[in-house]
């Protein structure tokens, strides 16, 4: 498909069963309320298994003990993952104390998991604790509405929003966009918060009765940082400033990383530039992009339903013109912007208001008390005394934001004593994994549990070749759905089977190029052997300041992906 040969605006054919399920759900109610009272199973049945996703939950089970339980003729140990809605990752210390308590007392694993979509997840919530978790969140001004399934998910925003006036304004827009695109159904309030059914007809003016064809992800990004990885997202607002003040956004549409092994109709894709818009049109444009995808997205094949596929089918210019028509504007030409990096600046950074921000590296975002490193207790102690707020970053780290000079030493002392400020290598700081085993039902290979020891070995290779002070953006994702964003890394590992990964090379440091598969279905020793040779070559042959990904392309080791819809699989 190309601009010259656009496909149909709407794909005709038999709708997927998910479309039937949404239509029959009575605006996402289903029979969830009744299912909650069924004590015969630890899970949700039938359509409710999928409907709870619209309420921010996934039903999972512990895969480490799945076979053992099957032998004992027991059902899997069902438990829910809950993902909070937290635009821009900002959470108050009061909210943090509440989630710390819930995680410790009411989840199987006792941990808080920071995600690369700037929010937190609880893993291992038993069915009896599902309603209490929603009520706990509500009591501190939070919710889990629309953080999963066919909605606009948690809206990301470049971290450190108080570092300048620009950051503060961008964060406010992230919140506004999130609120504007929320579903209007009262199902969430009725089921979880016991609010009375009101005798009015539900309406979904933006999302429609069957919601979106597939998940939809939005970011607000402040150059030169691309910490939120805009090219992994459907709709991106790139902040444009004049004299330090936000004046508008460049809009980029149609990024996304999920693929299916061996299915050449699926591909990762970077977002396309649509144009510049002044601030006052932001919500109208956001709504227009969402409703165009609502109406034109493929509802006959969920593997081909995301915005990136709609753009390729109808053509970028056609989609853009429809957004202009619906929003009642004409995009101006893209304003200049550039990215220089996407990692977090670990440690103390001083803001323009003379307050300090402390970015803590949290490996894999997993907050738990480890032997000799009581991370969870340490953060709770900081939350009890800190007057500012916490900010979760898209790199799964945590910022203690807005610390006055007078409080700095006290907070640093707790952080150091809790193992929250242990020195790590630049390589570890720039490596990331999704959750994968044991809780993710889609996992094909280990990711979070694999990464720490794998990076030990990579650190040894970096030292061997004299590049320990450098880093390679390295990511591991347990399956091709790609939550670990490996398809925007310089080195991406995509899980294929237990202990086996596809090795992708040729992305870049700033996250604007999709990496190509270099070797398929290989083991950790094979991965390390390949990287040993390639890191050695990079160390010897690179040009000044040349990142590993750019080197692999320039040296002809891997062909760059220039047009992923057509050449990703070549």
Curated annotation (Swiss-Prot):
Source superkingdom: Bacteria
EC number(s) on file: 1.8.1.2
Enzyme class, UniProt record, top EC level: oxidoreductase
This protein's UniProt keywords: 4Fe-4S, Amino-acid biosynthesis, Cysteine biosynthesis, Heme, Iron, Iron-sulfur, Metal-binding, NADP, Oxidoreductase
Keyword Protease: no
Positions contributing to [4Fe-4S] cluster binding: 434, 440, 479, 483
InterPro entries for this protein: CysI (IPR011786), NiRdtase/SiRdtase_haem-b_fer (IPR005117), Nit/Sulf_reduc_fer-like_dom_sf (IPR036136), NO2/SO3_Rdtase_4Fe4S_dom (IPR006067), NO2/SO3_Rdtase_4Fe4S_prot (IPR045169), NO2/SO3_Rdtase_4Fe4S_sf (IPR045854), NO2/SO3_Rdtase_FeS/sirohaem_BS (IPR006066)
Gene Ontology molecular function, alphabetical: 4 iron, 4 sulfur cluster binding; heme binding; metal ion binding; NADP binding; sulfite reductase (ferredoxin) activity; sulfite reductase (NADPH) activity
Catalytic activity field: hydrogen sulfide + 3 NADP(+) + 3 H2O = sulfite + 3 NADPH + 4 H(+)
Gene Ontology CC terms: sulfite reductase complex (NADPH)
The protein's required cofactors: siroheme; [4Fe-4S] cluster
Pathway this chain belongs to: Sulfur metabolism; hydrogen sulfide biosynthesis; hydrogen sulfide from sulfite (NADPH route): step 1/1
PROSITE patterns: NIR_SIR (PS00365)
Pfam families: NIR_SIR, NIR_SIR_ferr
Family: Belongs to the nitrite and sulfite reductase 4Fe-4S domain family.
Functional description taken from the UniProt entry: Component of the sulfite reductase complex that catalyzes the 6-electron reduction of sulfite to sulfide. This is one of several activities required for the biosynthesis of L-cysteine from sulfate.
NCBIfam families the UniProt entry points to: CysI, PRK13504.1
Protein's name according to its UniProt entry: Sulfite reductase [NADPH] hemoprotein beta-component
Lineage start: Bacteria, Pseudomonadati, Pseudomonadota, Gammaproteobacteria, Enterobacterales
Recorded name of the encoding gene: cysI
């Amino acid at each position: 498909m190309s601009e010259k040969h656009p496909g149909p605006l709407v794909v005709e054919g038999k709708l997927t069963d998910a479309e039937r399920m949404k239509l029959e759900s009575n605006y996402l109610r289903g029979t969830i309320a009744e299912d909650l009272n069924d004590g015969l199973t630890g899970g949700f049945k039938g359509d409710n298994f999928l409907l709870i996703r619209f309420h921010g939950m996934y039903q999972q089970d512990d895969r480490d003990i799945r076979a053992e339980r099957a032998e004992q003729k027991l059902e899997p140990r069902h438990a829910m993952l809950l993902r909070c809605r937290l635009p821009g990752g900002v959470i108050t210390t009061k909210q943090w104390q509440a989630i710390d308590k819930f995680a410790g007392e009411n989840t199987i694993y006792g941990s808080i998991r920071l995600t690369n979509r700037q929010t937190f997840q609880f893993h291992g919530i038993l069915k009896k604790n599902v309603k209490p978790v929603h009520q706990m969140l509500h009591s501190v001004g939070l919710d889990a509405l629309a953080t999963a399934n066919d909605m606009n998910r948690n809206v990301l925003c470049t971290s450190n929003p108080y570092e300048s006036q620009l950051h503060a304004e961008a964060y406010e827009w992230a919140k506004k966009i999130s609120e504007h695109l929320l579903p209007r159904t009262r199902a969430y309030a009725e089921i979880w918060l016991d609010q009375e059914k009101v005798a009015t007809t539900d309406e979904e003016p933006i999302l429609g009765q069957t919601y979106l064809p597939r998940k939809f992800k939005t970011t607000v990004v402040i150059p030169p940082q691309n910490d939120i990885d805009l090219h992994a997202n459907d709709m991106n607002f790139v902040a444009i400033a004049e004299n330090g003040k936000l004046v508008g956004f460049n809009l980029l549409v149609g990024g996304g990383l999920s693929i299916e092994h061996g299915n050449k109709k699926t591909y990762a894709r970077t977002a396309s530039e649509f144009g510049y818009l002044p601030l006052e049109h932001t919500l109208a444009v956001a709504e227009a992009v969402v409703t165009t995808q609502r109406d034109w997205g493929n509802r006959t094949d969920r593997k081909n339903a995301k915005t990136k596929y709609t753009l390729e089918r109808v053509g970028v210019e056609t989609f853009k013109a429809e957004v202009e028509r619906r929003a009642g504007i004409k995009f101006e030409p893209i304003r200049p912007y550039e990215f220089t990096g996407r990692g977090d600046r670990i440690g103390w950074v001083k803001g323009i208001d003379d307050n300090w921000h402390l970015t803590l590296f949290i490996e894999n975002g997993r907050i738990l008390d480890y032997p000799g490193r009581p991370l969870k207790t340490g953060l709770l102690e900081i939350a009890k005394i800190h007057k500012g707020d916490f900010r979760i970053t898209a790199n799964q780290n945590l910022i203690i934001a807005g610390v006055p000079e007078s409080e700095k030493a006290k907070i640093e002392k707790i952080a150091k004593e809790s193992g929250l400020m242990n020195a790590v290598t630049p390589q570890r700081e720039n490596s990331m994994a999704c959750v994968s085993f044991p809780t993710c039902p889609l996992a094909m290979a280990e990711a979070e549990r694999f990464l720490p020891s794998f990076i030990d070995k990579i650190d040894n290779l970096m030292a061997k070749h004299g590049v320990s002070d450098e880093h390679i953006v390295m990511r591991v994702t347990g399956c091709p759905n790609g939550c670990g964003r490996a398809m925007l890394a310089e080195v991406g590992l995509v899980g294929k089977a237990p202990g086996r990964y596809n090795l992708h090379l040729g992305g870049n440091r700033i996250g604007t190029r999709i990496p190509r598969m270099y070797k398929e279905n290989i083991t950790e020793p094979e991965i390390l052997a390949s990287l040993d040779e390639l890191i050695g070559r990079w160390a010897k042959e690179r040009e000044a300041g040349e990142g590993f990904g750019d080197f692999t392309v320039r040296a002809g080791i891997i062909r760059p992906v220039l047009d992923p819809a057509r050449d990703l699989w070549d």
